Amino acid sequence: MKRSIFAPNLIKNAHFYKIEMKKVVYFLLALVVVGLGACDNGPKFKVQGEVTGAADKMLYFEASGLEGIVVLDSVELGSDGCFGFVGARPESPDFYRLRLDGKVVNFSVDSTETVTLKAEADKFDTDYVIEGSASNQKIKELVLLHGELQKKVDKLSQNRGIPAGIAQQTLSNLINEYKNKVRKEYIFSAPNTTYAYFALFQTLNGYMIFDPMANKDDIKCFAAVATSLNNTYPHADR
């Protein structure tokens, strides 16, 4: 069989093609690396701090989005309990949280601030110190107020000696007392803040405390916050 006069050229062209393809691949990889570097150089916020008594435990950094909780990063804490996370600056104020052994600390971020948290592992979600934003101190106050309400409701439900009618009235009084305080001190006083928004969506045993579908006064709370935040952040998703 005669050897084709085109064979050497085909082999030569194939070799040339492989070389060129390698160049293209390297070029594309370089573009990806540069692109990732460019994304990584965008505005950031930091979350850092220390959790004592939490050696070898996992600490999770999560986003509290409209579609649910998303884990952004995690770290296994060392003996010193120090940690640090970095996140891309949100386009508008958004909510995040740190989770340790099922205990959660909620906080908000609206710029490139540094949020610093110090806590003990066994009191992670109740006795923590958070710095870097006045809103986050208010969110902590709301969490503690809610915790006190939950304790009172739990105690009431465990008292089997109270007639059902009295128990129901007592429950309503507890909830209304809580709502009046939050409405006055956290919602209407500063409706354009993240903590006012946070207050609206707290729940009690699975039910919304402020329920715009069942209470006309609650509608006013939602309207005040929605109007204020929309004026301040017209392009926000929330």
What feature does the model see in each segment?
Residues 219-238:
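N-proximal helix/coil linker or "cap" segments that precede and/or mark the start of modular domains
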Residues 192-207:
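Amphipathic alpha-helical repeat scaffolds of TPR domains
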Residues 39-185:
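A non-transmembrane, solvent-exposed segment enriched in polar/low-complexity residues
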Residues 176, 188-189, 193, 218:
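Inter-repeat boundary and helix-capping residues of tandem alpha-helical solenoids
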Residues 208-218:
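Short coil/turn connectors between adjacent alpha-helices in alpha-solenoid helical repeat scaffolds
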Residues 1-50:
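Bacterial Sec-dependent N-terminal signal peptides
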Residues 184-188, 201:
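Amphipathic alpha-helical repeat scaffolds
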